[in-house]
From Swiss-Prot:
Catalytic residue list: 189 (thioimide intermediate), 196 (proton donor)
UniProt protein name: NADPH-dependent 7-cyano-7-deazaguanine reductase
Provenance organism: Klebsiella pneumoniae subsp. pneumoniae (strain ATCC 700721 / MGH 78578)
Stored InterPro entries: GTP-CH-I_C/QueF (IPR043133), NADPH_dep_7-cyano-7-deazaG_red (IPR050084), QueF (IPR029500), QueF_N (IPR029139), QueF_type2 (IPR016428)
Lineage, opening ranks: Bacteria, Pseudomonadati, Pseudomonadota, Gammaproteobacteria, Enterobacterales
Similarity section: Belongs to the GTP cyclohydrolase I family. QueF type 2 subfamily.
A Pfam family that the UniProt record links to this protein: QueF
GO process annotations (BP): queuosine biosynthetic process; tRNA modification
Cellular component GO terms, alphabetical: cytoplasm
Location in the cell: Cytoplasm
Length: 281
């Protein structure tokens, strides 16, 4: 259980509740969650964040009607800046997108502008939206996270309760610059406790991080209840606090749910996240 899973900011969410699906446009379906909800306990404040970054969403189930009533389909790419006051709750995002299904729009640009306006209002930040026709994406290869995978270690684990203490004393010795990857990240939805599966890329420069300790730390998220974005910020904050690298970037790509995948990244250096879906996305 997290320290804030009964917080009043979560009380009005449709997540975890029986919901009617609407197929005509309704921007009021979108619901935001204050980023401060998990940042305050971590000692992170909007005016002095130790990182920059964004939440990258892929919208796989996006459809509307053109001016003549002919259905249109697209794949959407959305970026919410880490500086927005709110993150967008994913079930509300899905319900909102469903409301486009039987709504007529004059053009693709109108759809993109509507998404940009509504998501920016919900997040209280400047959101970027791009729409892609299917033939623009056909033949696109499966992407991979660059780096050394740390998953094949011959270690025994019997504790799956979250603990940042696994990182205590994890960094020592000479300064290195490396990128590590794990596909074993699994956390749970803050409200429903349904599993969230992800791959995480950690790029840093600093004292070498012990890979066994890092893997034990990542595996300890297995019973942890937080939203995707919150988990990435926690990982960044914990590594920065315990390992004190000169530079650090954390990027996670989660499997899709409800036609959406969420891919947050946070960095205090020069980092450009690779886009493109992974094998499990």
């Amino acid at each position: 259980m997290s320290s804030y899973d009964n917080h009043q900011a979560l009380a009005g969410l449709t997540l975890g509740k029986s919901t009617d699906y609407r197929d005509t446009y309704d921007a009021s379906l979108l619901q935001g969650v204050p980023r401060s909800l998990n940042r305050d306990p971590l000692g992170l404040h909007a005016d002095n964040l130790p990182f920059h970054g964004a939440d990258i969403w892929t919208l796989y189930e996006l459809s509307w009607l053109n001016g003549k009533g002919l259905p249109q389909v697209a794949v959407g790419h959305v970026e919410l800046p880490d500086t927005s006051l709110n993150l967008v709750e994913s079930k509300s995002f899905k319900l909102y997108l469903n409301s486009f299904n039987q709504t007529r729009f004059a053009s693709w640009q109108d759809v993109a502008e509507t998404l940009t306006r509504d998501l920016s209002a919900c997040a209280q930040g400047k959101v970027k939206v791009s729409l892609y026709r299917l033939d623009e994406l056909e033949g696109q290869p499966i992407a991979r996270l660059h780096g050394t995978c740390i998953d094949d270690q011959d270690i025994e684990i019997d504790n799956y309760q979250f603990s940042a203490d696994y990182l205590q004393g994890a960094a020592s010795g000479k300064i290195v610059e490396e990128t590590l990857v794990s596909h074993l990240l699994k956390s749970n939805c803050l409200i429903t406790h349904q599993p969230d599966w992800g791959s995480v890329q950690i790029q840093y420069r600093g004292a070498k991080i012990d890979r066994e300790q890092l893997l034990r730390y990542l595996v300890s998220f297995r019973h942890h209840n937080e939203f995707h974005e919150q988990c990435v910020e926690r990982i960044f904050n914990d590594i920065l606090r315990f390992c004190q690298p000169e530079s650090l970037s954390v990027y996670a790509r989660y499997t899709r749910r409800g036609g959406l995948d969420i891919n947050p990244w946070r960095s205090n250096g020069d980092f450009s996240p690779a886009t493109g879906r992974l094998a499990r996305q």
